[in-house]
């Protein structure tokens, strides 16, 4: 089992023990993070970024690691999240294999990876861990907490669990609860991993690794991350050249199949399967309705921020724009000046990672007005 930690990653030690919402605790755990910009003397210019399932804390290039980050188009000097103005902290989720303690990390009690002995992970656990990092920077209140995809859930959990922790919130392609369609897709992804004989109840290694299960899980994910509209225009029904196919009668034939295969093969050995299972399930479990007798809008209305922006792509099938509209409506009911923007982007759920032409102006406009 392997962890994948970018150069320049910083670490914060969590309180020990660190209890989990659903029971159990970690001892000697840590959270990975990176920072950009300069914290103001009164610590009033801090922004927290909480991420989706797979990203590390390296959202953008910085002095510690000049390599481009996963959100390079959004974060940096003069960009939408302007590090000349803001002090930005990006936290890798608890339960990940990219620096924060997760199932692939060594259990200090045994000297072996936690594997399935890792406590049942919830979005709220990741939110509490992120705030430990924020407090360690000397920040009592954030100017804004920004979350995308799973991070949109984490950001809402941060705001629910820590009243007054932020003056504003940007929710990008996120939600206050998992929808049945999303739960169904993620359940199939987890099943593909668990049915691979090499998963072996979580006891795999580099030589006996559930590669087939991870490939299928990733392909299913990529299908939900993009959109049919994009693929119609990008691939159509174009077939592969003869030198790109093999003798398998049911092998790859269309360009879109090759695209999925390439994405899957690039991912399978760079994300730990058990971490994937834990983080995926945490999204299915998350539901702000738990905080308001089963009413998700009432749960959102309990959150107190001054301003909020909820934004998404109209082609997103995993976190559809109705969920961002719901976030804005619920926060507005709680007294926030909340705005919803649905963008006409063809790139589905992943649009926030690639369609900077549409997403950056909305985020910049909101933050510039703070």
UniProtKB/Swiss-Prot annotation:
Catalytically driven reaction(s): succinyl-CoA + L-serine = O-succinyl-L-serine + CoA; L-homoserine + succinyl-CoA = O-succinyl-L-homoserine + CoA
EC primary class: transferase
Keyword Cytoplasm annotated: yes
Subcellular location per the Swiss-Prot or TrEMBL entry: Cytoplasm
EC number(s) reported in the record: 2.3.1.-, 2.3.1.46
BP terms from Gene Ontology: cysteine biosynthetic process from serine; homoserine metabolic process; methionine biosynthetic process
Residues annotated as domain AB hydrolase-1: 46-355
InterPro entries recorded: AB_hydrolase_1, AB_hydrolase_fold, HAT_MetX-like
Location of the active site: 149 (nucleophile), 316, 349
GO MF, any single term: homoserine O-acetyltransferase activity
Superkingdom of origin organism: Bacteria
Pathway: Amino-acid biosynthesis; L-cysteine biosynthesis; L-cysteine from L-serine: step 1/2
Residues covered by region (Important for substrate specificity): 52-55
Entry binding sites for substrate: 218, 350
Quaternary structure, from the entry: Homodimer.
Role summary: Transfers a succinyl group from succinyl-CoA to L-serine, forming succinyl-L-serine. In vitro, also has homoserine succinyl transferase activity.
Family named by the database record: Belongs to the AB hydrolase superfamily. MetX family.
Protein name: Serine O-succinyltransferase
Organism of this sequence: Stenotrophomonas maltophilia (Pseudomonas maltophilia)
């Amino acid at each position: 089992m392997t962890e994948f930690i970018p150069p320049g990653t910083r670490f914060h030690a969590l309180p020990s023990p660190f209890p989990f919402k659903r029971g159990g605790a970690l001892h000697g755990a840590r959270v990975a993070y990176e920072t950009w910009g300069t914290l103001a003397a009164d610590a009033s210019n801090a922004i927290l970024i909480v991420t989706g399932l797979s990203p590390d804390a390296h959202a953008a290039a910085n002095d510690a690691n000049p390599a481009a980050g996963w959100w390079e188009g959004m974060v940096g000097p003069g960009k939408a999240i302007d590090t000349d103005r803001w002090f930005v902290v990006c936290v890798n989720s608890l339960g990940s294999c990219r620096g924060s303690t997760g199932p692939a990390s060594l259990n200090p009690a045994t000297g072996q990876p936690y594997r399935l002995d890792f406590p049942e992970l919830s979005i709220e656990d990741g939110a509490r861990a992120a705030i430990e990092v924020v407090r360690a920077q000397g920040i009592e209140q954030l100017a804004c907490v920004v979350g995308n995809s799973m991070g949109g859930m984490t950001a809402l959990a941060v705001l629910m669990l820590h009243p007054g922790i932020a003056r504003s919130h940007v929710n990008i392609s996120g939600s206050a609860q998992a929808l049945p369609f999303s739960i169904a897709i993620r359940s199939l992804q987890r099943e593909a991993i668990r049915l691979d004989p090499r998963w072996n109840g979580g006891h795999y290694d580099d030589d006996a690794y559930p590669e087939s299960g991870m490939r299928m899980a990733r392909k299913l994910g990529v299908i939900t991350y993009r959109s049919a509209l994009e693929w119609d225009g990008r691939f159509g029904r174009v077939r592969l050249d003869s030198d790109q196919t093999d003798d398998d009668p049911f092998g790859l034939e269309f360009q879109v199949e090759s695209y999925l295969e390439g994405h899957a093969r690039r991912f399978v050995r760079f994300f730990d399967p058990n971490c994937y299972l834990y983080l995926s399930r945490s999204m299915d479990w998350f539901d702000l309705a738990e905080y308001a007798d089963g009413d998700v809008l009432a749960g959102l209305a309990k959150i107190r921020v001054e301003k909020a922006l909820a934004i998404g792509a109209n082609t997103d099938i995993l976190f559809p724009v109705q969920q961002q509209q719901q976030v804005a409506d619920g926060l507005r009911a709680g007294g926030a000046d909340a705005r919803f923007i649905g963008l006409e982007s063809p790139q589905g759920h992943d649009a926030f990672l690639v369609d900077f032409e549409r997403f950056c102006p909305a985020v910049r406009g909101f933050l510039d007005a703070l």
